[in-house]
Amino acid sequence: MQPFFALNRESNPEQQFRLLLEENDDCIDWWYKNGDSGKDNFSIAYTGIDKKQKAFYVDFVIRMKDGTICLFDTKTNGSDPEGVNKHNALVDYMKKESEKRNLKLIGGILIGEDKLTNWKYSPTYVDNINDTSGWDVFNPKAYSE
C-alpha cells in the first residue's frame, strides 16, 4: 500500500482506526480516508434530526482482500447526536447498492471500545448508537480471502 499522510484535524478515533488498518494491510487491497465535505468526497444523503436533508461523509472506504467493501464512520459513544440517522441512511444505501451492483458491502457507525482497540458496528438499523451490545466486531482477518 502507499503511504498515508494525515491531516492535522484527524480525530483520535480516526487515528486509532487507521492504525488498525495499517496493522492489517495483509487483509486489505486498499483504503481511503474520506474528506468531511465537498463534491470530491464520497457522501450519502440522510435526514437530520431537524428534518432537513444533509450529506453524510463516512470516514473510511476500504476494499478487503475478499472483495468486501467497508464504509465506516468512526465515533466514540455519545459523540454524534445525528449518529442514528446517519447509520440508518448508510444501511439503506448499502442494501440498495448491494442489490443493484451485486457488491458485498458492510459498514455503519463504528464505535471504538476498550481504549479504541475493539471496533463494533451494527449491520442492521439501530435506534441507539450508545449501546453496542449485539453489534458485530470488525475483524480485518475475517476478510482476507
Region locations from a protein language model:
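Electrostatic, structured charged patches in enzyme active sites and in nucleic-acid/phosphate-binding
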Residues: 1-145
